[in-house]
Amino acid sequence: MQQFGEHITAIPGGGRFRLGQALLILGGGSAVGGATAWFAAQLQQAWSPWLVFPLVAGLALGVAMVEWVRLVHAGHRGTIVVATLLAAAALTAGQHYFSFRAILRATRQKAPALEKARLLFPENSLQSPLPPQSFGPFLRWQAGRGRTIGRFVARGGLAWASWALDGLLSAAAALAVVGLWIRRRYGNLNQGKGL
């Protein structure tokens, strides 16, 4: 049994690029990112401090990716890193998609009451427009409505920039976990083979 701090230099099947294994880890990594996004979207409804939440989601994604890589016995470091980046992109986009689905579902449930209110008070009907029915226009609508960050509301380009920062923080946290695992599993990266 390997002791902590010892480095494995040769893992059966590890280190070589294999197309089948790459497709498995990349596809599975995207699924892991999507599943993590669903859990993050559920948690985000109750707790989502800015800057902290994307780091927590990224750490969870990193742990999930390590477990996925261990499950499929992936050994090619570059493939593992690319799969983690793909999973981080799925996490970031997935959180917005699952929020979109939740808002769409809530809007459909409230549609009869909203229609009655619109008929009774037509002058107020334009103050809170309904969200678009497709994902791309929904993101633009959401950016236009703004994202509250403390006492500041980021709208338009600033909302998009804050979402991009969330994605980068999640990716960095996931890569930190996966990178530490790779280093522990494959040894010091300075011994000739980098990521």
Language model: regions and residue ranges:
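Short, charged cytosolic
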Residues: 1-7
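Hydrophobic alpha-helical segments, chiefly the membrane-spanning helices
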Residues: 8-104, 108, 182-187
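Core subunits and conserved enzymes of cellular information-processing
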Residues: 61, 73-195
